[in-house]
Curated annotation (Swiss-Prot):
It comes from the Eukaryota. One of its GO terms (molecular function) is RNA binding. The keyword DNA-binding applies. Disulfide bonds: none annotated. Residues 210-230, 243-296, 304-352 have a biased composition (Basic and acidic residues). This is Zinc finger CCCH domain-containing protein 42. InterPro entries: Nucleotide-bd_a/b_plait_sf, RBD_domain_sf, RNA_proc/Spliceosome_comp, RRM_dom, RRM_Ist3-like, Znf-CCCH_4, Znf_CCCH, Znf_CCCH_sf. Residues 156-179, 210-352 are annotated as: Disordered.
Amino acid sequence: MNPLTQVKNLQKINARESDLGISDEASWHAKYKNSAYVYVGGIPFDLTEGDLLAVFSQYGEIVDVNLIRDKGTGKSKGFAFLAYEDQRSTILAVDNLNGALVLGRTIKVDHCGAYKKHEEEDEETRRQNREARGVCRAFQRGECTRGDSCKFSHDEKRAANTGWGHEEDRSSKWDHDKNREGRGVCRAFQRGECTRGDSCKFSHDEKRAATTGWGHEEDRSSKWDQDKLNGAKKGGTSFGNRGDFKPDVEEKSYRGRGDGDASYGRPKERERVDREDMGPRSRDAYDMKEQKRSGRYDNAYSRRHNDEIDYVREDKGSRAQDWEKRKAESRRDRNDREEKDRDSLRREDRRR
């Protein structure tokens, strides 16, 4: 809400209570009977604590004046808190000075219910509190504009040791970490995309990055070079390094095995017979096999139905022809019925 609107609202409340003759116990001032502080807003920036004493002391003795100033520049922010020795003086100040004109500015005077007096801290206490809060991140980036009014520490040494300071000081962020090499090589560094530099938690060893197969394109071939020398690993199934490997037996056992067959790769006792070496089971199968061998196999043969199982549709357009046939028959039947109806009508006319 606009401060001038608040000033007018307070003046309306006071005028209405005065017209109605409301007692002090029922007045809105009784809500702040336990507070001797008043809030003063809209103060001209040139006024000092002495000027405020001169203006407000006419309604009672003032025991505390807190003119809020900027901690960096020391300039007034335009509002203050005053405390009277007698609480009844606050009622007089609010009723008489609210909306008053001081050096061309309308000031607002109102009760202050829960004001806590700010204890002034000495420089040593202020420094200790800043150190406890930590280093200012904006100061580490060189962007803090609060100066001495900042709540956080501006210690350049601490800023350099956190890794958030200047570029040359950020390397100290992970210097205490002795297990950095144990975490492995940074994959972003291997691809040439890591931007963390020395602050990265993972190793940036170029030699190790080259032997992992994750580095540059010419170094990725070294990923499996060690397996070429070591051969098949213990317990593996590499055919090139097995002494008992038999191509024919392995191929036949692979063809005949099912999913989850534990006998794969083991010599079987029974004789393996290729199914293709067996004779044809029927004459049709024999003819089909001969056609496949000679290249004269008709694919349409496999698309036909068996006469014993289902009917064979020789003509692809038979369905449309059947539909036309049924349609023509229904048309003839309808014409015949109409002709019979006309004949019956003519016979009746003759009788009449």
